[in-house]
Amino acid sequence: MSAAAPFAQFAYLRSPDQSASQPVLHPVAIVGAGPVGLSLAIDLAQRGLKPVLLDDSDRIGDGSRAICFAKRTLEIFDRLGVAKPMLEKGVSWQVGKVFQAGECLYQFDLLPEPGHKMPAFINLQQFHVEKFLIDRAQALGIDLRWKNRVVAVDNNRDGARLSIETPDGRYELEADHVVACDGARSPMRTMLDLSFAGEIFDDQFLIADVRMQAAFPVERWFWFDPPFHSGQSCLLHKQPDDIWRIDLQLSPDADAEHERQPAVVRPRIERMLGHADFELEWVSIYRFQCRRLQTFRHGSVIFAGDAAHQVSPFGARGANSGVQDADNLGWKLALVMSGASPDLLLTSYDSERSEAADENILNSTRATDFIAPRSAMERVFRNAALALARTQPFARRFVNSGRLSLPTPYTGSVLSTPDVDSWSAG
């Protein structure tokens, strides 16, 4: 495995704000230039606003991280003007197979009917997604400030003042609204003394991205108790450029630093692939986390993406839900900033995306309990469901290798009204 290198790097440029005698006021400041922050910035720019986008780094990292982007997210990317290159680069798929030991129990098709504009899912490394979004943001003239690290925030209902550290020193800016899209470890969350409520699971998983020529079909394959990884689970996905994502369950007491060493990872992959030639591209270890902030709006600061909520990777609900946060928030911020709607509209972001987060956490928790049973009774239920699924289609709905990401209907939203037979406007 070669040394990590940035996928892309960007120049730090001094902002005129840094020479101003007083903090400059911006309508919206977005903290974090990942998929969520970039999506929101593009959305706002397309609506005529001029957000400032701050990121403490100056590069896109090499790790693929999120890879699975759902139909709804692709529809959002299409509206933002970035779907075309993503579809061209990504690997489209809609069929999955579930195995136990060496036997295929069943397969499923996520988009059996024809005529859809977007595929059910594409697999595309997060660094490609970010690069396409950055290209679009630059084309729109968005004020994207690299190496601008927020180190303090003075937050109230009327706006916020951010203190920002740069290679040229510290400066301040003000914003009517600040959106924290700064990831799972969110410094913004820490600065506001906010914490997650939820659960961190004991089981660990190894992610390995390997480069190889393989004849596997472009499908999602999930194994329970495979012969090459006895008593655990495994996931296989194809990515662009002959890269394959492999997730391997590890024991709760596994030494993460030891397990990520190439000398330890390679034998595990070899047991799975046999004598196939492959190169390790990227390795990481993670634990399932299903947690969120109690509320996503705090004064003038609004949280989105992993800064607001975390779920396990199985089901592809992390990055997808974050982009959908941005989609929900963008038009509401635009209406409020234009004066066309009262500030109260922003409370619906909190209620609607809290509903989505709760649904994602519920599904992720259920998937985790099925994949890694924590009690003898859970294991008995899982094994019974797997045994029945071989021959009984009704039992397959109980098999949970990660319920895949779906849009949230917002049935409980304050913006939803009952259907009526007649409508006064025609």
PLM segments and residue spans:
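A conserved short coil-to-beta-strand element within the FAD-binding core of flavoproteins
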Residues: 146-161, 284
